Amino acid sequence: MTRRGTVADDSFEGGTLVRIIVVGGAGTIGTAVVELLSARHDVVVAGRRSGDVRVDISSRDSVQSMYRRIGSFDALACAAGEAHFGPFETMTDEELELGVQSKLLGQLRLVLLGRSLISEAGSFTLICGYIFDDPIPEATSFAVANGGIEGFVRAAALRLERRVRINAVSPGMAQDSYEQFGPFNPGRAPVPMLEIASAFERSIEGWRTGEIIRAW
């Protein structure tokens, strides 16, 4: 079920309803993003296990099926993507590949397959993370994926047509994940969920493109 509201946003035709796909909208960060955006927008939640539409971003066929089912849309925000978390000393190439295939290529796939379908002046907002700038030993796979996403966003922004924008949100350690990941991040304060969700809102409702919006 979608959630409907109204919007007055100069990035689109003012006063029109903005339809936003939130991939990973049932996850920790995605839930906060959906809660914030659904007050003013028509939000469609897409996820691998739950949501309005099922999608596995590591599968081209699944992403194409998602777009066919949803139809027209004005923005896509992704808060999904897996990567291996574990000691670098024992990491295998298969474990490293998880982050490349899911978090990195999965998000790029959303853009490549959706760029011709999104409304004019629409936007893509991907997710990377602080671990690219401030890595921890257990998250090498995350750092690799995050770096690739940042590079893609900056490069793609130069060539996207029809005034379509693209940005990435780089969240810090989310408040709702602190209990799980806090021990691996000594001295790092958790970031409130609203602050992270608001970074997605800035990307979608603003004018910027090719930027990494840091929420940490």
Locate predicted features:
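Rossmann-fold cofactor-recognition segment
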Residues: 47-61
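Catalytic loop of short-chain dehydrogenase/reductase
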Residues: 99-100, 108-109, 123-149, 153-158, ...
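Substrate-binding pocket helix/loop in short-chain dehydrogenase/reductase
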Residues: 87-88, 95-97
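Active-site-adjacent segment of SDR/Rossmann-fold oxidoreductases
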Residues: 117, 134, 155-164, 207
